[in-house]
């Protein structure tokens, strides 16, 4: 059976919401950054050698909330974040640091095209730094640990007709944890960092 992919490279296609989004600050503003279209962020298929004819890009505006580690999913979200950009980045529209004591919650709604009926639907993440828990329609789909590796889940059993809800909880201790990292540190310094 042909598999379909929903990509999380990760949220809404609403003109009202896109009018509300703006970069968080003016740090490292490039020509490319000024041309971001929140309704069509990074529209290209991310894995050309594995391209499928039917797929959905979930990049865009998502709801987000920052909560202490271990709390249940929020009932109310703090605002909008532009996925796939990290919360610390200007292009996320948030520009905040989290730290090891907080979880970052993402939420969005999506509808599966009717022509996908009877097909398997995969939810694919290019990477989530560092630990991610995923729910579709309040059904836990799975968990992944590792900030540099892509992963997928078959979400077919959790889908319903019409609107579906996707929730992702992320925890990243940055340099307070034991996971491998590049330049990610809580107190950046030296010649490799901009301020």
Regions found by a protein language model. Give the residues of each.
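N-terminal pre-domain segments of enzymes
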Residues: 20-55
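Predominantly extracellular/luminal regions of secreted and cell-surface proteins
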Residues: 60-83
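Short coil-to-beta-strand transition motifs
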Residues: 53-57, 102-105
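Aromatic- and Gly/Pro-rich amphipathic surface segment
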Residues: 76-96
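Extracellular/oxidizing-compartment recognition motifs
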Residues: 26-29, 36-38, 87, 100-103, ...
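Bacterial Sec-dependent N-terminal signal peptides
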Residues: 1-21
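Accessory beta-strand-rich segments of carbohydrate-active enzymes
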Residues: 63-67, 96-195
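Short clusters of hydrophobic/aromatic residues that line enzyme substrate/ligand-binding pockets
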Residues: 13, 32, 45, 81-83, ...
């Amino acid at each position: 059976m042909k598999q379909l992919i929903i990509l999380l490279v990760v949220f809404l296609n609403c003109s009202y919401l896109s009018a509300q989004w703006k970069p968080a600050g003016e740090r490292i503003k490039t020509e490319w950054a000024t041309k971001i279209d929140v309704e069509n962020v990074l529209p290209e298929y991310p894995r050309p050698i594995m391209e499928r004819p039917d797929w959905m890009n979930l990049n865009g505006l998502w709801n987000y909330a920052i909560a202490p580690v271990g709390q249940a999913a929020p009932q109310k979200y703090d605002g909008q974040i532009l996925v796939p950009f990290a919360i610390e980045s200007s292009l996320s529209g948030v520009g905040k640091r989290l730290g090891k004591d907080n979880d970052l919650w993402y939420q969005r709604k999506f509808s599966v095209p009717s022509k996908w009926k009877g097909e398997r639907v995969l939810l694919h993440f290019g990477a989530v730094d560092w630990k991610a828990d995923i729910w579709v329609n309040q059904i836990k789909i799975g968990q992944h640990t590792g900030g540099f590796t892509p992963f997928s889940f078959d979400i077919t059993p959790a889908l319903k007709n019409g609107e579906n809800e996707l929730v992702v909880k992320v925890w990243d201790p940055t340099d307070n944890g034991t996971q491998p990292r590049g330049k990610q540190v809580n107190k950046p310094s030296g010649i490799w960092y901009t301020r």
